[in-house]
């Protein structure tokens, strides 16, 4: 669905919403959560996605993680997928950092593959081949390990603070 609650055509990217007998009718005793999560009986999952040409649902990211760089909306998952294709990279997580002028800017935490070397400028040159200029991370930090949350999952939100950026 789009931001106005309209169902999008195949290929249109928006929030994944579900409805049916197997979907909860709402949160018990939590009117605020219900108002934020339900629209005309549709449960808003917080996931971003689209139906591909074969009719399969493709999850493209989480709405809370979308980076708003001067009004441009950037999926960190898209940036991750491009950077992960570089042979020197073992793991990557792209995330938002605060920017005085643009509101948010893109950063990426990179774990290099064993024995690999890669400079920030080499990675940016590589990314220019596959990403629009405004989607290339401004800040690239190389780390031995990407911090994880309490559940062991990589968490984009709050990563800038954990890395001191």
Task: Report residues per predicted region.
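Short helix-loop capping/hinge motifs at secondary-structure junctions, enriched
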Residues: 5-7, 117
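Active-site loops of AMP-binding adenylate-forming
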Residues: 1-4, 30-33
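General small-molecule cofactor/ligand-binding pocket signal
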Residues: 140-143
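Active-site glycine/GP-rich loop and adjacent strand/helix microenvironment
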Residues: 9-10, 26-29
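FAD-site-proximal beta/loop scaffold in flavoenzymes
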Residues: 41
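AMP-binding/adenylate-forming catalytic core of the ANL superfamily
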Residues: 15, 20, 25-26, 33, ...
């Amino acid at each position: 669905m789009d931001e106005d609650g309209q169902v999008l055509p195949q290929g249109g990217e928006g929030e994944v919403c579900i409805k049916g007998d197997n979907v909860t009718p709402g949160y018990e005793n939590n009117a605020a959560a219900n108002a934020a999560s339900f629209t005309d009986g549709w449960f808003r999952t917080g996931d971003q996605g689209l139906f591909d040409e074969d009719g399969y649902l493709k999850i493209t990211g989480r709405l809370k993680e979308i980076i708003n760089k001067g009004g441009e909306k950037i999926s960190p998952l898209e940036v991750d997928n491009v950077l992960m294709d570089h042979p020197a990279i073992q793991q990557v997580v792209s995330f938002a950092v605060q920017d005085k002028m643009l509101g948010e800017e893109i950063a990426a935490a990179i774990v290099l593959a064993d024995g690999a070397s890669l400079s920030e400028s080499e990675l940016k040159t590589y990314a220019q081949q596959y990403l629009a200029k405004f989607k290339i991370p401004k800040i690239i930090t190389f780390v031995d390990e990407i911090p994880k949350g309490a559940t062991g999952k990589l968490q984009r939100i709050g990563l800038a603070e954990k890395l001191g950026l």
